Amino acid sequence: GGADAVRRCLRSSGLEASYQLWLGENLGRADERMRLIPADAPLPEPLQPLLVALLIAKEPSIPNERALPLFGLEDGLYLQHPDHPGLMTKREARIQLLADLELPDQGVLWDLGAGTGSIGLEALRLRPQLRLLAVERRAGGAALIQANAERLEVMPSAVVETDALSLLSADLPDGLDQPDRVLLGGGGPHREALLKAVLQRLRPAGIVVIPLATLEAVATLRPLLEQSGLTVQLNQLQAWRGQPLSDGTRLAPMNPILSLKGTKS
């Protein structure tokens, strides 16, 4: 327990690079002490029983782009919303969703409900000639995606901070055509209407991939794909991450994701 448990939690969640770990001992007493613990340093011993572990958010260091793998980047490389750390498409799911998109050499990719931008930005690292439209309605989302793009040295064609359904009801940003690939990660209660709007614009041989959390969402959206004449595939993505214990390692389950894929003939 204690400080060691906090550190294990950070490591297993991929957030160790996003926080400084401070230890406060005997706070308010004459012998109080505050210490910053480097990520690669062992915890000091002995620690006082009256102990507080404090996590202070920090911006991850700028990655060396040449040292990064081609895809499957660690979650901690991305800047994230400070009030929702860890709220992003995790590495294991990101790899599978990129595979499901079957990215072409060239074309237009829409990332709707882009979050931190992780999937669309990794797609640009794999296929630099793609034109990416990233849409995120959350306040500050566009600035976050642009900052992550700069860190990874890729350039989206457009990053828009708005509701995706409202955007598709109007004219597209300049320089962007209809999509060849769509990742539909947002929509909320309007997901059904959003999918209908996407299908109206999807090019022939285009692919739409929809990560979902519930069977009810699949039951609602799958018929729309089938009625529109798309070839439909459904997969469940499930992964576990090793989490260190005092005497070994346990496998901590990650949230399962249902990947609904439609391919236009």
PLM segments and residue spans:
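C-terminal substrate-binding/active-site "lid" region of AdoMet-derived donor-dependent transferases
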Residues: 197-258
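Short beta-strand element of Class I
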Residues: 129-133
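S-adenosyl-L-methionine
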Residues: 135-176, 190
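A short, conserved alpha-helix within the catalytic core of class I
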Residues: 189-197
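A contiguous loop/helix-start segment that scaffolds small-molecule binding in enzyme catalytic cores
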Residues: 1-84
